[in-house]
């Protein structure tokens, strides 16, 4: 899937319902109800410049609702923003709820700090009073959402600025949902026989989450390694050595072996149009084919809004990809290692390829031997990798897991602490969670998970919650 489709503005259908009974009512100075609503619409649209809007005009009649449905369907909107501009007859709204194809919707009610009128004795003030009856319209319309019933509707209320921010959050989740349905997961080349808990149902993956899955054989991997040009290998090797210090005990020929193993994955992802590359980096066939496991993370994945994850964990790959789509940031793949109760912290990280390309933290990366496999008999045993002390700061930690045909999305906030490189073979950091560390993991153990999580700078729990609700996931925000 090309980058432009993954990084575009969310497409929203704007559904604004108003009363045909009030439409032509007029005051002597400030125009008709319709004139005032047209001005209100311009203010609403101007607050949504972060969206690619489909706006069919104010919905007064059945024909307006039908026009809106056709426009939204033709334009393949990611979601719908629905708002009553005052009290209104509800026939057009109910028809829309019944007939509009399934798409997420955010149903909004906007409150004002203060009314523009004190009494309704003046005719213009009376029209303003009618225009201000958004609450009665929303209350009237809310029951039909449940009675139809209409799935995937989020109800929000607040000032215009507050509602706009909630729409912004919702839009990121809705775009992610749409992109997932056109994405491709590439698994090289089989499930992880060492970790059965990572297995998921691939039919459900497509029908309930969206991506297709393609299996990428090791025979292809070997061919991609073999056809790498010397110039291509040298270019990437020089890029890495110019950016990062290489430790003295790294053998250069083994470094080149790892560069080749990494570049072949990038080229396979590119040629097969893979958005989420799930790499079984501990399978013996990986080492037999490449002589080592890939240890670097080509910037191509970030440029293409794609991800690369290890250990054949499709669920962990998906949550990494979701966070990539939502945030556009560098996302890291971790497993919690151990708790240090004295400090209220846990160590976490992972071996294998991990995104080390954050431009602000290039000083946290060393090219170091993968000592875990240094004493094996594989061709490039002890080949190096990008040893990354994961960037400090507050992060969202999230995991996605399958249980009996349902999915669970678990997230929390953790602080990555600054410090030196500590754990050989693993990109890593020390985390201090906002929840007391023993309580956090006891709660996760009771929910039931696996060991793999994605972490990214910032708080994205609101976006993850909206996405989970759209996708029908169980959602756990541990705080």
What are these regions (language model features)?
Residues 10-12, 113-237, 243-247:
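Cap/lid and interdomain-hinge subdomains that line or gate substrate/regulatory clefts
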Residues 237-326:
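Long, internal scaffold/assembly segments composed of regular secondary structure
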Residues 20-38, 128-135, 193-198:
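Glycine- and acidic-residue-enriched helix-capping/strand-helix junction motifs
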Residues 65-77, 94-97, 262-271:
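Short, well-structured alpha-helical segments in soluble
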Residues 302-421:
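C-terminal catalytic subdomain
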Residues 86, 95-122, 127-137, 299-312:
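Short, acidic/small-residue loops that bind anionic groups at enzyme active sites
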Residues 77-86, 106-108, 274-280:
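Periplasmic-binding protein-like
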Residues 38, 375-479:
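Extended hydrophobic packing segments that form well-structured cores
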């Amino acid at each position: 899937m090309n980058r432009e489709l993954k990084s575009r503005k969310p497409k929203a259908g704007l559904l604004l319902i108003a009363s045909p009974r009030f439409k032509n009512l007029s005051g002597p100075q400030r125009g008709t109800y319709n004139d005032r609503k047209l001005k209100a619409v311009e203010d609403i649209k101007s607050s949504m410049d972060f969206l690619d809007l489909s706006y069919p005009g104010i919905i007064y009649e059945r024909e307006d609702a039908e026009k809106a449905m056709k426009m939204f369907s033709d334009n393949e909107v990611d979601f719908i923003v629905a708002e009553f501009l005052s009290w209104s007859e509800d026939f057009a709204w109910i028809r829309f709820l019944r007939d509009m194809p399934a798409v997420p919707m955010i149903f909004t009610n906007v409150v004002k700090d203060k009314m523009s009128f004190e009494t309704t004795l003046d005719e213009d003030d009376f029209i303003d009073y009618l225009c201000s009856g958004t609450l009665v319209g929303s209350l009237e319309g809310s029951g039909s959402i449940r009675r139809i019933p209409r799935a995937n509707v989020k109800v929000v209320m607040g000032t215009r600025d507050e509602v706009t921010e909630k729409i912004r959050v919702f839009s990121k989740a809705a775009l992610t949902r749409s992109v997932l349905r056109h994405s491709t997961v590439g698994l090289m080349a089989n499930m992880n026989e060492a970790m059965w808990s990572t297995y998921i149902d691939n039919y459900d993956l497509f029908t309930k989450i969206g991506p297709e899955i393609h299996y990428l054989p090791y025979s292809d991997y070997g061919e991609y390694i073999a056809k790498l040009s010397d110039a291509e290998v040298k270019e990437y090797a020089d890029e890495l050595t110019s950016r990062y210090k290489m430790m003295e005990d790294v053998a250069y020929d083994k470094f080149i072996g790892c560069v080749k193993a990494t570049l072949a994955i990038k080229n396979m992802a590119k040629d097969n149009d893979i958005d989420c590359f799930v790499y079984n980096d501990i399978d013996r066939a990986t080492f037999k084919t490449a002589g080592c496991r890939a240890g670097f993370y080509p910037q191509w994945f970030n440029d293409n809004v794609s991800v690369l994850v290890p250990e054949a964990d499709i669920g962990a790959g998906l949550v990494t990809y979701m966070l990539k789509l939502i945030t556009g940031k560098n996302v890291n793949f971790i497993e919690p290692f151990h708790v240090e109760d004295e400090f209220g912290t846990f160590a976490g990280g992972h071996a294998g390829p991990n995104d080390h390309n954050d431009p602000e933290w290039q000083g946290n990366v060393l090219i170091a031997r993968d000592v875990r496999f240094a004493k094996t008999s594989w061709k490039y045993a002890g080949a190096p990798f990008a040893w990354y002390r994961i960037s400090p700061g507050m992060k969202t930690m999230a995991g996605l897991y399958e249980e009996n045909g349902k999915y669970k999305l678990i997230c929390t906030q953790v602080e990555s602490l600054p410090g030196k490189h500590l754990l050989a073979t693993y990109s890593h950091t020390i985390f201090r969670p906002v929840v007391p560390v023993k309580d956090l993991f006891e709660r996760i153990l009771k929910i039931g998970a696996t060991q793999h999580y994605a972490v990214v700078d910032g708080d994205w729990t609101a976006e993850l919650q909206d996405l989970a609700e759209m996708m029908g996931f169980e959602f756990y925000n541990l705080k």
